[in-house]
Amino acid sequence: MILGIGSDFCDARRIEKSIERFGARFTERVFTPLERAKAERRARPAETYAKRFAAKEACAKALGTGIARGVFWRDMGVVNLPSGQPTLELTGGAAARLKEMVPEGYEPRIALSLTDEGPLSAAYVIISAELIGTPR
């Protein structure tokens, strides 16, 4: 069953301006250490950060909270499965909110799709619940 859907767009030029203006204060407030390490290895870190920023916004919308009510930026981190598929790892307030959303006897699933074209990035998040033991 679908519990929440969120989407967001982000312009890497906006992220780049925030990094120029605030530097590490911005990146450390918004992104997990893993996300920062990945972005800083890239030729165009702002584009990598923009995809992750869009994913966090989309996830916060799917959670039904936005970046509020105890859900903070670093509570949502984009990680890759061994297959390379992106997903979200939730901690803190985001994990607590996810737990509230999932009915007893079910387990959460988070689907994340990321795309970009030039400086523009988009993310789509679907939070669903499946009966415990349902094959993936």
From Swiss-Prot:
Protein name: Holo-[acyl-carrier-protein] synthase
Subcellular location, principal: cytoplasm
Keyword Magnesium assigned: yes
GO molecular function: holo-[acyl-carrier-protein] synthase activity; magnesium ion binding
Location of the protein in the cell: Cytoplasm
Organism the protein comes from: Azorhizobium caulinodans (strain ATCC 43989 / DSM 5975 / JCM 20966 / LMG 6465 / NBRC 14845 / NCIMB 13405 / ORS 571)
Gene3D superfamilies: 4'-phosphopantetheinyl transferase domain (3.90.470.20)
Described purpose of this protein according to its UniProt entry: Transfers the 4'-phosphopantetheine moiety from coenzyme A to a Ser of acyl-carrier-protein.
Designated gene of the protein: acpS
InterPro entries found in the cross-reference section: 4-PPantetheinyl_Trfase_dom, 4-PPantetheinyl_Trfase_dom_sf, ACPS, Ppantetheine-prot_Trfase_dom
